[in-house]
Amino acid sequence: MQENFILKNGKRVLIRDIVPDDYDAMQTYWQALATETIFTNQYVGRKPRSKESFDKQCDNPYLWGVGVFDGDKIVGACQCFVFHPEHLWCGYTAQFGIHMLEAVQSMGLGRHLMTLMENWCVSQGMERIEGSVRTQNHKAISLYLKCGYEIEGLSKRKALIDGVWHDEYRIAKLLNNVRA
């Protein structure tokens, strides 16, 4: 998958599949993301994922992942994976994560990435997409609600950040895609 996308400010970025050669760029991206926000699971000083683990993830047929590139620099990403792909009863649920640097937030990119991700889920026969979002992340919550996601529950004390507990909403969208 590869396509150009024009942000609301007129800047052009490239959205494409993450591949094993993107390992170093992803490590740089994770570090930059960790300095900008507490709304992801990235934090300053986190040990980098191994190259072997990254390569394995890139080759997983049950995982969809794209990066948003500004030149050679990754400025955003979206991933989605089938939670239990081989399970007869539960193989219709996908989990997602989306994140981007502040410079490209509120530029129409999030909604577009969500649409691409949902299209992949439909092509995989998914019925449900789910994720979590920190309750203070108002931009993301607004995006998810606009995209048709619902808040299904609250996970209390999900993350302890700088001595403060943070709750997370559990969110989901039903795709009505299952073949009966």
Q: What residues fall within each predicted segment?
A:
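Terminal substrate-recognition subdomain of acyl/acetyltransferases
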Residues: 1-8, 161-180
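Acetyl-CoA-dependent GNAT
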Residues: 45-103, 114, 174-177
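A short gly/proline-enriched turn/hairpin at secondary-structure junctions
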Residues: 36-44
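Conserved catalytic-core motifs of GNAT/GCN5-like acyltransferases
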Residues: 130-133, 145, 150-166
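Glycine-rich phosphate/pyrophosphate-binding loop shared by adenosine-nucleotide-utilizing enzymes
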Residues: 11-13, 72-77, 166
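A short beta-loop-alpha structural element at the N-terminal edge
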Residues: 12-26
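Conserved acetyl-CoA-binding loop-helix of GNAT-fold acetyltransferases
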Residues: 106-119, 123, 142-146
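Short glycine/proline-centered loop/turn elements that form peptide/ligand docking sites
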Residues: 114, 137-140, 157-162
